Amino acid sequence: MTSTINRQLLEDIDAHAKHLRFMYRIKGFGYERAIELPLIAEKLQPLFGKKLRYLDIGTGPSIFPSWIATHTQWDVTCLDKFTWVEVQNTYARKLGLDTSRFHVLVHDFLDVELEPESFDVITNISVIEHFEGRLDEVAMAKSARLLRPGGVYVLTTPLNEGYARDWFVKQDVYGESYTSEPVFFQRHYDVASFNERIVKASGLVERERIYFGDYDEPFFNDRIVEQHGLKKIGRTLLQMQTVKHALKHGSYRDVPVSMPGMKIYTSAGVCVQMTK
């Protein structure tokens, strides 16, 4: 099975991003997100006409919750441990959103107390890979308890079959200071570790799984990530046409990307839809 990105949804999300931030008009809102977000939107779209409670975990400056809020009457909650999530309030004002149904919480997800089974929809978008050690399993179990019976849980995360890896960097990361020892940044799962640490740990029922990325040409890996010197100019020129390149190189399949030379940032991953 091979399917392509929903052009209409991608262009709509891109227009939303450009309205929110001038930077996105210049460099796009992220090539990897241009593959990932339309897929999530497509999975949630059948629910848009209902009045639901929605939680996005690890929101940060993501454009997705505000996009959802403009297309639905959902009660939206954005949650992140860092204050950068407060930009969501700026987005809400710019879009004229009803703030009685758009909430921004600055809390560590592992510590915050939320009512069990209180959300109809939960998204976990390229976040779970940043939980160090076995905390990803803890986070999955905790977040699953927040889902109402019959609710929808959509998660995406990097996956590189045959090359699972924990990445450490020599710089400050998400509040962790680099001194002498490299700091954990994120994880690339493989199918086995994803099944064990994400799906099984959640206790939820998997309904659908789709792998995504650049299959025919490693465009993002070779031409966007970690470019130096004059190559940065070429990268920026490519980023200015994020939508065009995502439509050309990105796709969805029933088999995962497997790339021995994959860099730390990747457009390759998995999207799983689960329920209770």
Task: Locate predicted features.
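Short catalytic micro-motifs in class I SAM-dependent methyltransferases
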Residues: 126-130
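Conserved class I S-adenosyl-L-methionine
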Residues: 49-60
